[in-house]
From Swiss-Prot:
Name by which UniProt lists this protein: Phosphopentomutase
One term of GO molecular function: phosphopentomutase activity
Catalytic reaction(s) noted: 2-deoxy-alpha-D-ribose 1-phosphate = 2-deoxy-D-ribose 5-phosphate; alpha-D-ribose 1-phosphate = D-ribose 5-phosphate
GO biological processes: 2-deoxyribose 1-phosphate catabolic process; 5-phosphoribose 1-diphosphate biosynthetic process; metabolic compound salvage; nucleotide metabolic process
Required cofactor names: Mn(2+)
Source species: Streptococcus equi subsp. equi (strain 4047)
Cellular component GO terms held in the UniProt record: cytosol
UniProt entry keywords in alphabetical sequence: Cytoplasm, Isomerase, Manganese, Metal-binding
Residues reported to bind Mn(2+) 2: D298, H303, H351
Pfam families per the UniProt record, alphabetical: Metalloenzyme
Membership in a protein family: Belongs to the phosphopentomutase family.
Keyword field contains GTP-binding: no
Gene field: deoB
Domain of life: Bacteria
InterPro entries xref list: Alkaline_phosphatase_core_sf, DeoB, Metalloenzyme, Phosphopentomutase_DeoB_cap_sf
Length: 403
């Protein structure tokens, strides 16, 4: 008999809560991540009013300095803590895979100086299109289309770029390079980056529209991941006949492995919340896990180093949190967390090595408060214990703390 019939895991992509102990080993533009603090710096510099997350207990998460504008509520309704990453990476895939119980000890390859000429030439030969060499380096996804979009519109060349993550991204104007053609090229790029010297976590198709000076990336993004190297708790659940529902890019991150129901990509955070609520309302969803990723925090504001936009995005989620809770059953459990940091006030443009917050709420819990600090994989270990399946590689359940 499960303690909770349904568990809903919501990842607020990049919403870190302070530098991790090993942040000195991770860098942004040559600056160690040691002073990164996504939530803390947003609260400090832009102001942060998230009363619904505060009510669950966000302000109670232990920190060297309390969140400036998020109070520690006198009577929180949920359990909270912060979790540390053990894997050797700070990218989306590593974070999500570890949350589901894997320890990534050999990181994927990153290309600070751009991809080898061998890879670029193979993409050119397959696609019949030239690649803009000047874009072949770590680049902000919005800046790269601002810088090279006009040229692409004139020449039809491909914009191939990377980031601090182990990813190869191809940006293409939808009126110049049709989306289906872009997808085919990305599928090929995936096939040639499955082993070293270019072992990549993801290939990302990045379609955009508009005119020079006002380009906009569209919702037709598509991720081509590799399957996890070992079974995650998602696989354990699916193998036991327990439903797993993926909302947003979760299906892409796990390459469909262990996902029994893909609810589709999100056009925005708000659309993703709508999809999550529809998932909660499904008559067939009586037992199992829903797993949601809301990416706008990261993609639209973290990488762009926009603390005010990031703040507003957090406000939007917080305003809609009561809707999510209202569609839960009394014996449901809501887990809100993140996958890494992306401090919008920090140096560089890439992720930051941080603790992630964990908020746990269920109407069936009569207690509340701070539970012991743990690690990312403790989330999947808790889910596994609840549903009576084995854990994956790592993780310690905190199910007994939720009373």
């Amino acid at each position: 008999m499960s303690k909770f019939n349904r568990i809903h895991l919501v990842v607020l992509d990049s919403v870190g809560i302070g530098a991790a102990p090993d942040a000195d080993k991770f860098f942004n533009a040559g600056v160690a991540d040691t002073d990164s603090d996504t939530l803390g710096h947003i609260s400090e510099t832009a102001g942060l009013a998230v009363p619904n997350m505060a009510k669950i207990g966000l302000g109670h998460i232990p920190r060297p300095v309390p969140l400036k504008t998020v109070p520690a509520e006198a009577d929180p309704t949920g359990y909270v803590t912060k979790l540390e990453e053990v894997s050797l990476g700070k990218d989306t895939m590593t974070g999500h895979w570890e949350i589901m119980g894997l320890n990534i000890t050999e990181p994927f390859d990153t290309f600070w100086d751009g991809f080898p000429e061998e890879i670029i030439q193979k993409i050119e030969a397959f696609s019949g299109r030239k690649v803009i060499r000047e874009a072949n380096k770590p680049y902000s996804g919005t800046k790269v289309i601002d810088d090279f979009g006009p040229r692409q519109m004139e020449t039809g060349e491909l914009i191939v770029y990377t980031s601090a993550d182990p990813v190869l991204q191809i940006a293409a104007h939808e009126e110049v390079i049709p989306v289906e053609e872009l997808y085919r090229i990305c599928e090929y790029a995936r096939s040639i980056t499955l082993e070293r010297p270019a072992l990549l976590g993801r290939i990302i198709a990045r379609p955009y529209i508009g005119e020079p000076g006002s380009f906009t990336r569209t919702a037709n993004r598509r991720d081509y991941a590799v399957s996890p190297f070992q079974d995650t708790v998602l696989n354990k659940l699916a193998d036991a006949g327990i439903s797993t529902y993926a909302v947003g890019k979760i299906n892409d991150i796990f390459n469909g492995s262990g996902i029994t129901n893909d609810m589709g990509h999100n056009k925005s955070n708000s659309h993703g919340i709508d999809t999550l609520i529809k998932t909660l309302q499904l008559p067939a969803f009586t037992k199992g896990l829903s797993f949601t990723n809301l990416v706008d925090f990261d993609a639209s504001f973290g990488h762009r180093r926009d603390p005010e936009g990031y703040r507003d995005c957090l406000h939007e989620f917080d305003r809609r949190l009561p809707e999510i809770i209202a569609n839960m059953k009394d014996d449901d459990l809501l887990l809100i967390t993140a996958d890494h940091g992306n401090d919008p006030t920090y140096a560089g443009t890439d992720h930051t090595r941080e603790y992630i917050p964990l908020l746990a709420y269920s109407a069936s819990c009569t207690g509340a408060g701070v539970i012991p600090q743990g690690h990312f994989a403790d989330i999947s270990a808790t889910i596994a214990e609840n549903f009576g399946v084995d854990t994956a590689m790592i993780g310690t359940s905190f199910l007994a703390d939720l009373v």
